[in-house]
């Protein structure tokens, strides 16, 4: 029995600013992901605060929210078997210098903050995050 899942991926401002969104989308497609929905948007800091609410008590929370709302982002719903784990593997470690060769963050990430992509960390959070950006 297949385990087709959906997950949310965000191409963050640093990557969009460098016009890497199409290259990153190709990386997903080459790994068998179907991009079900995608849109380029700019969110307000208050929306970023709501999105990252789970990190509210962490010291990096304000910087994270300011960064996500600092420029256009591309939000996508990705679908494939075991999509959540597959996306996490393709993104690579949070710190680009710790990420494995061939991962998005190793290839395009600048720093722990400007690491080019976000991905849902669980099936449950994927549902919540997809609903956050695609309420239809």
Model-found features: residue ranges?
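Non-catalytic terminal and connector segments of soluble metabolic enzymes
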Residues: 1-136
């Amino acid at each position: 029995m297949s385990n087709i899942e959906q997950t949310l991926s965000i191409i963050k401002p640093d990557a969009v600013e460098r016009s890497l969104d199409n290259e990153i989308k190709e990386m997903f497609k080459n790994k068998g992901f179907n991009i079900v929905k995608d849109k380029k948007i700019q969110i307000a800091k208050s929306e970023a605060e709501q999105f990252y609410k789970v990190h509210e008590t962490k010291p990096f929370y304000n910087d994270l929210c300011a960064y996500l709302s600092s420029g256009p982002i591309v939000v996508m719903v990705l679908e494939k078997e075991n999509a959540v784990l597959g996306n996490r593997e393709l993104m690579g470690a949070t710190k680009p210098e710790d990420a494995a060769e061939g991962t998005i963050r190793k290839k395009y990430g600048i720093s722990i903050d400007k690491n080019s992509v976000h991905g849902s960390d669980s099936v449950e959070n994927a549902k919540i995050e997809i609903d956050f950006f695609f309420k239809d």
